[in-house]
């Protein structure tokens, strides 16, 4: 059958040449690129461009012809340049003919800088600054950092906010080179920002295991309590005690006050160490009585079987009563066996003090005391840990031991932390987090104060008013003491 209707034919001529040439690289963060297009058609505006965004979606581009030379056109298109090559597609006549290329990306120039106080033992805070401000957002978004401390570059663990990056997982006391890139997801990577830092040392607590000791007190045959007699009318006798105390090198106590070897009355009621080592030597001596006998020497029970958490020595701080000018109690007469050869008369004792152990030095003379706290220290730990035992006094059930840590730069407090230690019969681990309120200074001074009581004070009258002790008298001990804190194995943690 032959149609009588006219037939209309439409013929579309496609150009023989339509290709995209390799474009020049653009900086990460660029919003446009220039694409060389080889095209022998009559109207370059018929070519439509698109690119794949970071989510993989096709985005249409705006385009402008910048120049044309014979069949080669330089076309500027809108893009979003990320950290990997930008895939470009050009289409003609509704997609009947397409061409594709990829735009390589370059890391825009930037610097990496770090303030000295921003470099810690295991972390460092660095700032990335683009040479051209228009690329700062791209640097903030795409920069990846690498470190080198051994001759090999490794991807650095870091977090960032804006252009400030915090590198973590660093090694203490180590020199690092740092560089960065924004185009790490393409084959040809370029880097910028060479920077060199040295991390702080991860210094430990000075002599924190209390193993390095020096002798501070050696007392021989002072009166242990008052005089006593087994029967009324018999001669009276005097028990004595001898002891040697060692303290950790670099640390100080208030023993010069509580165990004052210059006190007018050298008696155990008035001269009582508030700090001592678990490896101390202490011997009580009871004189023998003619005919009856019953004398002997021994160590008081409180000083027996003392142990350290690790190593050979721990330190003990305790509340004690003391008196620089104490008066001897009257003799005590009794009619009991030799196990009771001691005086039960308790004198009036003027003062009560908490035991203290602290970094620094201490002096006492004529009712005047001086604390020189702290030691040179240039690291910045995040936490102090240690082990303790604590026995409160029966007269103050709410009492606790206290440990405080302070890091300073001269007079400026950088960080501090305090913990109250409650009753514990066995060694128990404790943690003191250090809260930093100033981070734009380096540390140069460390203070640690360990006290047997939360009533501890720099005022002697306040301590005497608030600290409780219990009187103890037995065959080999005569003193008034209270809450007791044993401490060992102090160490710093760095994060």
Where does each model-flagged region fall?
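Proline-enriched interdomain boundary motifs that mark the N-terminal boundary
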Residues: 14-22, 107-115
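Short, exposed coil/turn segments at beta-strand boundaries within extracellular/luminal domains
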Residues: 1-4, 92-100, 185-192
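Beta-strand-rich modules
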Residues: 170-186
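Surface-exposed, short loops/turns at beta-strand junctions within beta-sandwich domains
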Residues: 69, 77-85, 167-175
């Amino acid at each position: 059958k032959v149609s009588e209707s006219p037939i209309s034919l439409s013929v579309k001529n496609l150009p023989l040449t339509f290709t995209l040439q390799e474009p020049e690289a653009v900086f990460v963060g660029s919003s446009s690129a220039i694409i060389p297009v080889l095209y022998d058609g009559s109207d370059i505006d018929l070519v439509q461009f698109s690119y794949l965004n970071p989510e993989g979606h096709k985005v249409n581009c705006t385009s402008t012809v910048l120049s044309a030379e014979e069949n080669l056109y330089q076309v500027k298109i809108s893009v979003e340049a990320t950290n990997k090559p930008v895939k470009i597609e050009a289409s003609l006549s509704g997609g009947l003919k397409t061409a594709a290329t990829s735009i390589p990306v370059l890391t825009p120039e930037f610097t990496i800088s770090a303030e000295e106080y921003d470099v810690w033992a295991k972390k460092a805070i660095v700032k990335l600054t683009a040479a051209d401000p228009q690329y700062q957002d791209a640097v903030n978004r795409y920069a990846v950092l690498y470190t080198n401390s051994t001759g090999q570059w490794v991807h650095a663990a870091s977090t960032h906010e804006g252009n400030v990056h915090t590198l973590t997982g660093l090694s203490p006391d180590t020199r690092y080179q740092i560089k960065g890139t924004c185009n790490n997801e393409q084959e040809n990577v370029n880097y910028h920002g060479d920077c060199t830092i040295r991390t702080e040392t991860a210094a430990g607590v000075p002599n924190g295991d209390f193993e390095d000791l020096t002798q501070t007190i050696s007392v021989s045959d002072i009166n242990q309590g008052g005089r006593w007699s087994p029967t009324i009318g018999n001669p009276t006798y005097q028990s004595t005690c001898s002891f040697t105390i060692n303290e950790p090198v670099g640390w100080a106590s208030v023993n010069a006050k509580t165990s004052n070897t210059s006190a007018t009355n050298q008696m155990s009621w008035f001269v009582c160490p508030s700090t001592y080592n678990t490896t101390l030597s202490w011997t009580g001596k009871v004189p023998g009585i003619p005919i009856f006998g019953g004398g002997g020497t021994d160590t008081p029970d409180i000083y027996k079987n003392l142990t350290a958490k690790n190593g050979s020595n721990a330190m003990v701080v305790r509340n004690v009563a003391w008196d620089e000018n104490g008066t001897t109690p009257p003799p005590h007469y009794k009619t009991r066996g030799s196990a009771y050869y001691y005086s039960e008369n308790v004198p009036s004792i003027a003062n009560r003090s908490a035991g203290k152990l602290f970094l620094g030095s201490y002096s006492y003379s004529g009712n005047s005391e001086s604390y020189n706290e702290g030691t040179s220290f240039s690291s910045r730990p995040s936490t102090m840990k240690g082990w303790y035992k604590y026995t409160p006094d029966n007269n103050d059930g709410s009492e606790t031991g206290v440990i405080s840590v302070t890091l300073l730069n001269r007079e400026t407090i950088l960080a501090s932390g305090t913990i109250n230690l409650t009753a514990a019969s066995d060694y128990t681990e404790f943690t003191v987090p250090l809260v930093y309120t100033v981070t734009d200074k380096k540390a140069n001074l460390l203070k640690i104060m360990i006290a047997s009581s939360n009533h501890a004070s720099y005022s002697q009258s306040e301590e005497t008013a608030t600290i409780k002790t219990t009187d103890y008298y037995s065959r080999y001990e005569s003193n008034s003491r209270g809450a007791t804190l044993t401490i060992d194995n102090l160490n710093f943690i760095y994060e």
